């Protein structure tokens, strides 16, 4: 029932057997028996244990190898690779062409790639960005024959290789890698820029290959381990080297007067480390190489004096230009023509002969000043006499308003409506200026009826009209009268629109009717004017009788219908109130009769009859 008891019994059963066996060997001593037992144990245990231990070690090594192999495969599978799908997706992300050959730039930086691959279709690349990856080798760039820029900084490169297909490569950046030797760059015929900062370069032999790069202009060797001053001999063998950066290397401390020495030995250098090499710095460095610090100081003073002189010369040139411009301006203000450049140069030549020669700088200043004036003359050509013409035009514009004002004032006592009544004469006289029209309008607005003369001054006004027309000599009114028997009373009414603003009332009407133009070219040709002239003096005395005896019957009947037949003779008179100064023409005829009489008068103008000429003596003066 109990397993422990059974185990004890089994042990007890085995022990007697051992005792029996020991009893069989009772002839031997106890020590011999112990040794024999130990030997048997060793023979039984020794080989088996060693074989087992070796098997265990082998199995452990195999397990470690299997685990490391699995880890490597997993790492290779987990890392990103340059697959075609990934590259197309990347091109789409950066808004590049899906067609690989059309892309000239490919951005593959910060992607974690460990090798370059699958770029065979990208044959048109000119710039390839592969920085900040895990690339360990330069490879698979055979299709990039048009590549100009290759950026491989911050990778795991140990060697420069496989760059032979890149025959057009211009810039190569291999900074922040583990490169120990510069090599395999002579196959790049147009390589211009090489950046090798933060690498493992140490000796002169590591950079000896740079002497074969004949087109290399920009070289960055900063933050390496270069310590031998003999590297300058390698750099001197580079004919096109312009920019050099050696900061962060021990060699900068091992070369005495580092900057001066490098500047003197590298003749074509224009930029060293963190600042440019100016011509002044190069001259001072060369003077230091010839005569030490004293020569350098003297050379520096000479350069400073030259720079100061150049500044003063430029200021003097500007002052000379300003002075000559002021002289020209004064000459133009005085009305004198400015001297040409040849005379100015001849005038300045005696002064130049008196003064000691200043050298080429003074000649350059003179040439610069002359060139500036020539350019100004070409851009802004000056017209001789232009100011005089402007003055003449200004005088004319000043005189014309005065003349127009005087003419307008002289026309005031004549007839104010000259422009309205004589359109044909105005057309032949020519178009007037806007100033004269404005002044004439102002004078028209200033006319008042109270200022008009009385009817008793008929003879005096006629004389003044003739005198004024002789003085001015410009005809203002051309009279066209139709001496017909039907237009007797309506003649004044038809001429009313022209004469409603006349200053002389009815006498003015008579004077305007028989006014003859003094100009021979514009004289009015009116038939029977000689017959009508004697009656002009007696018109005032017989005017009432003419209207009372010769008034047509239809007019009297029409006015009588309105209830004003008794006062019709008084109303039909032109203007009887001379004392009040209101000389208004009568408007007794209706509009219909006025239109008929105007039409009849226009017909009678063409063919005057002898009967009309006889009756004109009595009725034409109305």
From Swiss-Prot:
Lineage, top-rank taxon, reads Eukaryota
At what positions is Phosphoserine found? 349, 464, 487
Stretches for region Disordered = 1-80, 326-363, 481-505, 535-622
- What does the record list as GO biological process? axoneme assembly; cilium assembly
Give compartment(s): Cell projection, Cilium
Report biased composition (Polar residues) as residue ranges.
Answer: 1-11, 535-552, 568-578
The record's comment on protein family reads:
Belongs to the DNAAF1 family.
Question: What residue spans carry the Low complexity bias annotation?
Answer: 48-59, 337-351
Q: Where are the LRR repeats?
A: 101-123, 124-145, 146-167, 168-189, 190-211, 215-236
Name one matching Pfam family.
Answer: LRR_9
> Which residue ranges have biased composition labelled Basic and acidic residues?
32-42, 62-80, 326-336
- One GO CC term of this entry? axoneme
Instruction: Give GO MF terms, alphabetically.
Output: dynein complex binding
* Name of protein: Dynein axonemal assembly factor 1
What are the UniProt keywords, alphabetically? Answer: Cell projection, Cilium, Leucine-rich repeat, Phosphoprotein, Repeat
UniProt keyword annotation of Phosphoprotein present: yes
> What does this gene product do?
Cilium-specific protein required for the stability of the ciliary architecture. Plays a role in cytoplasmic preassembly of dynein arms. Involved in regulation of microtubule-based cilia and actin-based brush border microvilli.
Q: Which residues form the LRRCT domain?
A: 249-288
Q: What is its main location?
A: other
Report the InterPro entries cross-referenced here.
Cilia_flagella_integrity, Leu-rich_rpt, LRR_dom_sf
């Amino acid at each position: 029932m109990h397993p422990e008891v059974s185990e004890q019994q089994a042990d007890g059963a085995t022990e007697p057997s051992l005792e029996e066996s020991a009893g069989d060997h009772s002839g031997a001593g106890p020590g011999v028996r112990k040794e024999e037992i130990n030997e048997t144990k060793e023979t039984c245990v020794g080989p088996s244990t060693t074989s087992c231990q070796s098997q265990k070690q082998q199995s452990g090594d195999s397990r470690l190898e299997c685990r490391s192999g699995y880890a490597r495969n997993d790492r290779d599978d987990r890392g990103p690779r340059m697959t075609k799908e990934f590259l197309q997706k990347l091109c789409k992300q950066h808004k590049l062409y899906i067609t690989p050959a059309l892309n000239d730039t490919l951005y593959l930086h910060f992607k974690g790639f460990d090798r370059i691959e699958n770029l065979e279709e990208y044959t048109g690349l000119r710039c390839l960005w592969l920085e900040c990856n895990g690339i360990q080798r330069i490879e698979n760039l055979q299709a990039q024959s048009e590549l100009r820029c290759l950026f491989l900084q911050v990778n795991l490169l140990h060697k420069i290789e496989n760059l032979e297909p890149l025959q057009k490569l211009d810039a190569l950046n291999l900074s922040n890698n583990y490169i120990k030797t510069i090599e395999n760059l002579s196959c790049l015929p147009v390589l211009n820029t090489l950046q090798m900062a933060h690498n493992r370069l140490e000796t002169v032999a590591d950079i000896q290959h740079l002497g074969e790069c004949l087109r290399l202009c920009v070289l960055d060797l900063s933050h390496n381990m270069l310590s031998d001053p003999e590297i300058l001999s390698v750099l001197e063998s580079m004919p096109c080297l312009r920019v050099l950066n050696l900061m962060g290397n021990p060699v900068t401390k091992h070369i005495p007067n580092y900057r001066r020495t490098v500047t003197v030995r590298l003749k074509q250098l224009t930029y060293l480390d963190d600042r440019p090499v100016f011509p002044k710095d190069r001259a001072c460095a060369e003077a230091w190489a010839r005569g030490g610090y004293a020569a350098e100081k003297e050379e520096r003073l000479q350069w400073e004096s030259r720079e100061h002189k150049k500044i003063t010369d430029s200021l003097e040139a500007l002052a000379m230009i300003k002075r000559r411009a002021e002289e020209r301006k004064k000459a133009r203000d005085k009305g004198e023509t400015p001297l040409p450049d040849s005379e100015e140069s001849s005038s300045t030549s005696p002064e130049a002969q008196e003064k000691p020669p200043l050298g080429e700088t003074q000649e350059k200043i003179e040439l610069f000043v002359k060139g500036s004036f020539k350019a100004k003359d070409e851009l802004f050509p000056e017209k001789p006499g232009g100011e005089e013409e402007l003055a003449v035009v200004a005088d004319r514009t000043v005189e014309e308003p005065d003349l127009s004002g005087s003419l307008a004032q002289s026309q005031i006592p004549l007839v104010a409506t000259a422009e309205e009544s004589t359109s044909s004469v105005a057309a032949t006289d020519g178009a007037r200026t806007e100033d004269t029209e404005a002044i004439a309008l102002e004078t028209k607005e200033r006319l008042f009826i109270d200022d008009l003369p009385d009817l008793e001054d008929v003879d005096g006004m006629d004389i003044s009209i003739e005198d004024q027309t002789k003085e001015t000599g410009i005809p203002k009114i051309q009279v066209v009268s139709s001496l017909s028997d039907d237009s007797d009373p309506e003649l004044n009414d038809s001429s009313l629109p022209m004469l409603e603003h006349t200053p002389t009332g009815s006498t003015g009407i008579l004077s305007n009717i028989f006014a003859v133009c003094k100009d021979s070219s514009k004289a009015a040709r009116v038939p029977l004017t000689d017959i009508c002239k004697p009656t002009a003096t007696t018109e005032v005395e017989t005017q009432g009788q003419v209207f009372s005896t010769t008034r047509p019957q239809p007019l009297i009947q029409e006015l009588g219908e309105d209830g004003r037949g008794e006062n019709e003779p008084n109303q039909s008179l032109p203007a009887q109130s001379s004392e009040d100064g209101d000389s208004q023409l009568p408007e007794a005829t209706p509009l219909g009769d006025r239109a008929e009489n105007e039409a009849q008068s226009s017909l009678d103008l063409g063919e005057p009859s002898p009967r009309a000429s006889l009756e004109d003596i009595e009725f034409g003066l109305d």
